Design a protein with these regions (language model features):
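Active-site ExK catalytic segment of metal-dependent nucleases
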Residues: 71-73, 144
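Vicinal oxygen chelate
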Residues: 1-8, 14, 38-39, 50-52, ...
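A cross-kingdom feature marking solvent-exposed beta-strand/loop segments within repeated
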Residues: 78-83, 125
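Core segments of cupin and vicinal oxygen chelate
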Residues: 7-10, 16-69, 113, 121, ...
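Active-site/binding-pocket entry motifs
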Residues: 57, 73-78, 149
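Intrinsically disordered, low-complexity acidic/polar segments
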Residues: 60, 79, 106-108
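Beta-rich, blade/repeat-based domains predominating
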Residues: 89-94
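Short, P/G- and charge-enriched loop/turn segments at secondary-structure junctions
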Residues: 3, 57, 82-87
């Protein structure tokens, strides 16, 4: 069903994933993927971090699109056996995030230099126009080109 007058102003504001160690996750999303923390909320036994790309210069968090919310439940970082289910093993569920880049080869070369773990490199498999990297919690992040053929 196409958008109607009632839904024309709707937009996807954010997606939330749970993280084990905020230091590792913030380092990854800020320094590997170039996102900025635009807001933070301390909720007692948990902390919420809201990250976005700064090219969308809107002051209010609610007016932005494509925000990533990282939820850290305090104490998980101290448990070496703790991990979150990333949705890509049984039982399957959540699949991946996706980041578009201007030059996918250059981005993947940079990820290699930074020691980022890959789930799928550009040279793997039949789909040679996408890659998948892994964040510190093993969430998959698809990397596509902004000029990717449709």
């Amino acid at each position: 069903m196409p958008a109607t007058a009632e839904t024309a102003s709707y937009r996807l504001n954010h997606v939330m994933i749970r993280i084990k160690d905020p230091k590792a996750s913030l380092d990854f999303y800020e320094n590997v993927l170039g996102m900025d923390v635009i807001d933070k909320h301390d909720g007692g036994d948990f902390t919420l971090y809201f990250l976005a790309y700064q090219h969308q210069k809107v002051a209010q968090r609610g007016e932005r699109e494509a925000i990533l919310e990282l939820t850290h439940n305090h104490g998980t970082e101290n448990d070496p056996n703790f991990s979150y289910h990333n949705g890509n093993q049984e039982p399957r569920g959540f699949g991946h995030l996706c980041v578009a880049v201007d030059d996918i080869q250059k981005a993947c070369d940079r990820f290699e230099r930074l020691g980022v773990k890959f789930q799928k490199k550009l040279t793997d498999g039949k789909m040679r126009n996408i890659a998948f990297i892994l964040d510190p919690d093993n969430y998959w992040i698809e990397i596509i080109s902004t000029s990717r053929p449709q």
